[in-house]
Amino acid sequence: MKKVNYFGTGRRKSAVARVILTNGTGKITINTRDFEKYLPLPATRLEMIQPLELTEKREAFDVSVNVNGGGLSAQAGAIRLGIARALIESVPELRAILKKAGLLTRDARCVERKKYGLKKARRAPQFSKR
């Protein structure tokens, strides 16, 4: 059987994930490491494979991911979006299912910048009345 690659890019906070789906057996590698070793927390692993579980394609594709930037939670979110986008490229009919579950929405929340005159983004220095 001919190997067919499907690509998807996901971003979350400062993490960027480039995902390649290949017809296979369900093997997932992140930065050339097994995904169980790369993501030690079960919650982040479940978040990452959510699109595959929802569409019942867990065993249909091998997933290869190159991810950098951000922490493990942000990377899991970026991978999730990348997998969802790659799944749509492979099977366009899955778009409705993924859209309804909210897996195609880029989470735009990121760290608010620090302003001058303040200690943090919104924390003002202590005020003394006298």
Swiss-Prot record:
Keywords: Ribonucleoprotein, Ribosomal protein. GO terms for molecular function: RNA binding; structural constituent of ribosome. One of its GO terms (biological process) is translation. InterPro entries: Ribosomal_Su5_D2-typ_SF, Ribosomal_uS9, Ribosomal_uS9_bac/plastid, Ribosomal_uS9_CS, Ribsml_uS5_D2-typ_fold_subgr. One of its GO terms (cellular component) is cytosolic small ribosomal subunit. PROSITE patterns: RIBOSOMAL_S9 (PS00360). The keyword Signal does not apply. Pfam families: Ribosomal_S9. The keyword Zinc does not apply. Belongs to the universal ribosomal protein uS9 family. This is Small ribosomal subunit protein uS9. It comes from Onion yellows phytoplasma (strain OY-M). The lineage of its organism: Bacteria, Bacillati, Mycoplasmatota, Mollicutes, Acholeplasmatales.
